[in-house]
């Protein structure tokens, strides 16, 4: 993915909120029956509820974030869990700083 596509992924208030919440999932989401908030990520259902959007709309936002390499999905049972790709995000930060 080109840098401009990554910046487009970040140019949405909902996706920025998702990334912010996923940085500290225990502070923003309730405990889950399946999956550890920190190790496995947050169930998409909880993210959709917090944003007050449909699961279909959330799926599109998460598709953009996954394609940008900012989050990683993990399937547990019938649920998809998402967490930040901290190494990729740090690499983007470093690239932005050195590129300016």
Model-derived features with residue positions:
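Short, compact, well-ordered microdomains
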Residues: 76, 87-90
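Histidine-centered active-site/metal-ligand motif
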Residues: 12, 61
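Alpha-helical residues within the helix-turn-helix
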Residues: 49, 60, 66-67
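Short, Lys/Arg-rich amphipathic alpha-helical interaction segments
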Residues: 89-100
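N-terminal helix-turn-helix DNA-binding core of bacterial DNA-binding proteins
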Residues: 8, 14-54, 80-87
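Beta-hairpin "wing" of winged helix-turn-helix
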Residues: 31, 67-76, 83
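Short, Lys/Arg-enriched N-terminal segment that forms or immediately precedes the first helix
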Residues: 1-7
């Amino acid at each position: 993915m080109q840098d401009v596509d990554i910046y487009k992924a970040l140019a949405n208030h909902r996706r920025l909120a998702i990334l912010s919440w996923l940085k500290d999932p225990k502070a923003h989401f309730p405990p889950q029956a399946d999956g550890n908030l920190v190790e496995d990520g947050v169930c998409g259902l909880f993210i959709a509820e917090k944003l007050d959007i449909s699961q279909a709309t959330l799926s599109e936002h998460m598709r953009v974030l996954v394609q940008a390499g900012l989050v990683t999905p993990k399937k547990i049972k019938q649920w998809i869990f998402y967490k930040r790709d901290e190494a990729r995000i740090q690499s983007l930060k470093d690239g932005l700083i050195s590129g300016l």
